C-alpha cells in the first residue's frame, strides 16, 4: 500500500505531462489545418482579366462572364523592405482623374479568382482604376510558411497597396476605395482600423471573430469546439502569433465619419451570416453623422459537380450579379465621387 502511495504522485505528473503534450500537439494540428493556405486558388490560376471563368473546387459554374473581361492591365510588384516580401498585383488605370479601388481576395484564393476579378471588372466598366493584389502566402506573392494570420499580418499587404495608390500614383485618400473578400475582408477591416484616411470599404462575407470561425469549423468536421483553445496556444508557441488576438470588429468600431458596405450570404456555411451582422451592428453603434453603413444579406448557393459540391460562401456576385453591380456602382459612386 505504501508503495502505491509513493508512486501515485509520479503517475499523476506523468498523466498531466502526457495530457499537456497531447493538448499542445492536437492544437498544433488544428492550428496548422485552420491556418494553412492552399495554393490552388480554387482552380482559378488560369484566369486573367482578359478571360476569366468562375470555378469552385476547380469546376466551372457555367456562368458566362465574357461581357466583363477587360484588357490594358499590367503586373507590378509592391516591395515590403521591412519584411522582405514581394506582393504581386495587377493594375488597370482609367482616366487620369479616376478614383481607384483596391481588391483583396480570400483564403486560398488569389487575384486570378472571379471573386475579385468580376467586381473589379464591374468597376473598370464604370471608369474606375483598379488594383488586384495577392496577399502574402497566396498567388504570386512571397511565401514564408504557407500559414495565414487571420488578417493580422495580411493587413500590411492591404496598406501597402493603398499607400502605393496614394503615394506613387498621387491619388487623394478620399478617392481610394477598398474591397475585401472573406479573409481579405478581415484584413481590409483591420487596415481600416489602422489607416484613418481609408474612407470607403466594401466587405464581402467578412468574419468578425476568428475564434468563432475556428470553433464552427471544428464542429463542422465533427470535433469538439473546446479544442480551439489548443489551436490558440499552438499558434502562439509554433507560429509566434495569436490569430485570435485581433478582430475585424476593430475596423467596424472605428468607422466614425467613414463609409462601410457589408454583404453576406444568408446560406454561407464557411462564415455564417451572424459574422456580417456583428460587423454591421458594431459599425452602426460607432457611426458618426457624416458616415454611412449599408448591410445586405444575399440569397442563393452555387452547385458544381452535378450538385455534389455546394457552397453559399462568397457567391453573391454570381447569384445576384445585376444587383451586386448596381449596389457597387451606387456605393462607390457616392463615396468616391466618380464624376467631378
Task: Locate each region found by the language model.
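N-terminal cap/lid segment of alpha/beta-hydrolase-fold proteins
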Residues: 54-96
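C-terminal catalytic histidine-bearing segment of alpha/beta-hydrolase fold enzymes
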Residues: 277, 286-340
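Short beta-strand/loop motif that positions the catalytic acidic residue
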Residues: 255-256, 261-264, 268
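N-terminal targeting or regulatory segments adjacent to alpha/beta-hydrolase or S9 domains
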Residues: 1-67
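Hydrolase active-site cap/lid region
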Residues: 190-241
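Alpha/beta-hydrolase active-site loop
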Residues: 148-169
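Conserved alpha/beta-hydrolase "acid-adjacent" motif
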Residues: 269-275
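Conserved alpha/beta-hydrolase
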Residues: 120-142
